[in-house]
Amino acid sequence: VLRISPIPPLRAAVSAYVELFRNIPVLCLLIFVVFALPEVGVVIDYEPCVVLTLILVSSSFACDNLRTGINAIDPGQIEAARSLGLCFMGIVTSVVLPQALRNVVQPMVTLFISVIISSSTGALVPLAHNELTGLVSRINTTDAMGIPTFLIAALFYVATGLVIAGVGRIVERRVEIWR
């Protein structure tokens, strides 16, 4: 929402944030957060590092998805709200966001599935025993059953993605406007 703000410094700051974190691979950012931040005195446990990395990257994509949903709104809707005397926040909360959120259900579902899949990068830091891919890797190391264990992990990721996509379709049908 701040990317459409009438305050230029806010727009610029959020645009810079989105452009920066949208273009950094999750793995590169995770390595930076885990290994480079302690070099400058910022020490964070591994689990919060993975969560922080996923939040930084996925929130930049969510901002862009929402901006796309906002851009899909007919400008006449906003002009009508202005003519009724609504302030910027009134327009955003009463007119823009309800329509924009309706427009971005599927892109947000896709983003959520992507975040679930990207969480597998957590296996690359000592968080490995708490994350599915890391657990499978440990089982593979101790029992030498690489293909079956990674196949099962892949099936878990596919099943999770299908459940999320199904919930997304239900939500999309619920918020759909029939014309």
Model-derived regions, located:
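Transmembrane alpha-helices and adjacent helix-loop boundaries
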Residues: 1-179
